[in-house]
Amino acid sequence: MSDQPAADAALSGLRLNLRILSVVMFNFASYLTIGLPLAVLPGYVHDVMGYSAFWAGLVISLQYFSTLLSRPHAGRYADLWGPKKVVVAGLAGTLICGLCYALAAFSSAVPLLSLLLLCLGRLVLGVGQSFAGTGASLWGVGVVGSAHIGRVISWNGICTYGAMAIGAPLGVVIYQRGGLLLLAAAICLISLTAMLLALPRPQVKSSKGKPLPFRAVLGRVWGYGVLLAMGSVGFGVIATFITLFYQARGWDGAAFALTLFSVAFVGTRLLFPNAITRFGGLKVALVCFAVEAAGLFLVWGAEAAWLVRVGALLTGAGFSLVFPAIGVVAVSRVPPQNQGSALATYTTFMDLALGLTGPLAGLIIAHYGVPVIYLLSGMLVCVAMVGALWLGRRAVGEK
């Protein structure tokens, strides 16, 4: 995206943040529609509809696969149409998802049809999320300039998990009051409101530099994307299976654990806004991976609900800065006119990890129980620590 005039580069921190928030709030709306059913759908598919943990995980993960496949198209259409139109298209996708949920509620007497409608809704939601999320990031960079891309990434993430922190418990309350149908109505209302707010906003100009082909961008960022993918598994198992973990233990309060994860995520970004600039992305990522792994191991071995909550808190705090810390390094590997493409390519690794986590973890649960997925996820994050060390040493060697 093109930089704004020099005067904009001197924006005060508050004004800069407000300008970013005025755009990434649309990603907040998109993720609110994701967070609302997050603590409801796994149990609904498993307990109400009677399907296995594999299908419960697959319903959630279909969204991530859809996001993965549509992310490159979101970046391409952002270049063709501008990020604003891509954001509006993404919000239209979340609206359609809400309608699919409503139809699934009406079809509850036919479980297979209801399941297919839920799956269709999750697929459309994935497209909507990739368009809204990618478009909001590029829109934010266009508003404040590419010099502030790290800040845009951080605020976009705060909106993402802030929406989930609000959405998970709110979705449980809505579901308890009116079932899946009322939850679907809430999703439709949020999506429509966000679309109406986005439409009057001005467009931003796209960069006129010659973009690198996708293969070239991928070649420069894939190593950092792999680290992101391994770190994202911890988020995936918390978000998708913490409800089933609580049920297996006979505990209540899974939605609160999700909220703690999201609160820790947002709080860490607010408490350490300059950590990446001060210490460097890979050094920050190392510390984050260590904290995330500790949280996952704690959940695995928890014998009391409060230990799971502490583990979720640590996992959220650790995962918080993983995306921007590694992302800033990844984006710096390409010319400025290709930063949007690099960011989208980098993000697809998280989409892939989250898409694989649901069904694979569901299969593992079917054979070995729920707790073991947190042990394996913690071990994978430890591998990411080794990878970050290696990339850091390679970067020093290149200098």
Please tell me what each predicted stretch does.
Residues 64-72, 164-165, 265-270, 354-355:
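Residue-level signature of mid-helix packing/kink "hotspots" within the transmembrane helices
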Residues 188-206, 387-392:
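C-terminal membrane-cytosol helix-exit motif in multi-pass small-molecule transporters
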Residues 69-107:
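Conserved MFS/SLC helix-loop-helix module at the cytosolic interface between two early adjacent transmembrane helices
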Residues 70-82, 175, 268-281, 365-366:
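Helix-to-loop junctions at the C-terminal end of transmembrane segments
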Residues 92-111, 291-303:
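C-terminal ends and interior cores of transmembrane alpha-helices
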Residues 18-60, 64, 236-245, 249:
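Helix-loop boundary and gating motifs at the non-cytosolic
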Residues 121-159:
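Cytoplasmic helix-loop-helix junction between adjacent transmembrane helices
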Residues 28, 113-131, 308-321:
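Hydrophobic core of transmembrane alpha-helices in multi-pass small-molecule transporters
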